[in-house]
Amino acid sequence: MDLKQIAGEYAATFVKDGMKIGLGTGSTAYWTIQKLGQRVKEGLSIQAVPTSKETEALAQQLNIPLISLNDVQSLDLTIDGADEIDSNLQLIKGGGGALLREKIVASSSKELIIIIDESKVVTRLGTFPLPIEIIPFAWKQTESKIQSLGCQTTLRLKNNETFITDNNNMIIDCIFPNHIPTPSDLHKRLKMITGVVETGLFVNMTSKAIIGTKNGIQEL
């Protein structure tokens, strides 16, 4: 069985009857959503908030009841993937382009469970390019200010055209030569740049990480 599938399906066991949950986006969250669809068919009663249009479509296909985050005060649990995670449960997310909605949903949840395969565990964040969501207006000015923090930047494309997020924004992917020693500081500095909507750094948000390894499930 695929390591992502092992982690994703195991995470679904943390979802209990009556919960309001956040559904993540990406190739690992896919397996959690598939498993939850199966459990809903078997009688599990939940309500879910999707973190992307892609996840919304999948949940609807599986008949998972969906709600708006505007209609609830908080969520019991969100299960989502990550592009990198360190030993302090700090994350880089946004490889799939849904980082803003993922962060809004995660910050509205009592618990955030991150599901990954062992290749995503790192000693220091930053090998994976850090996604930053920016508004399209004067985007080159915003990119220039991001570069002034010492990174190399690339405007994200899809099918040779500018990638547009579900929020009609753009994404700049950033590589920092010395990785990211203090993610919380970098996040604050990036957020101070006018035009930056959100960063893919998730700091002090994760409750637990479920890692699919060749030897089975490991929890952080």
From Swiss-Prot:
It comes from the Bacteria. Homodimer. This is Ribose-5-phosphate isomerase A. The gene is rpiA. Pathway: Carbohydrate degradation; pentose phosphate pathway; D-ribose 5-phosphate from D-ribulose 5-phosphate (non-oxidative stage): step 1/1. Substrate binds at residues 25-28, 80-83, 93-96, 120. It comes from Bacillus cereus (strain ZK / E33L). Disulfide bonds: none annotated. Keywords: Isomerase. The active site is at 102 (proton acceptor). InterPro entries: NagB/RpiA_transferase-like (IPR037171), Ribose-5P_isomerase (IPR050262), Ribose5P_isomerase_typA_subgr (IPR020672), Ribose5P_isomerase_type_A (IPR004788).
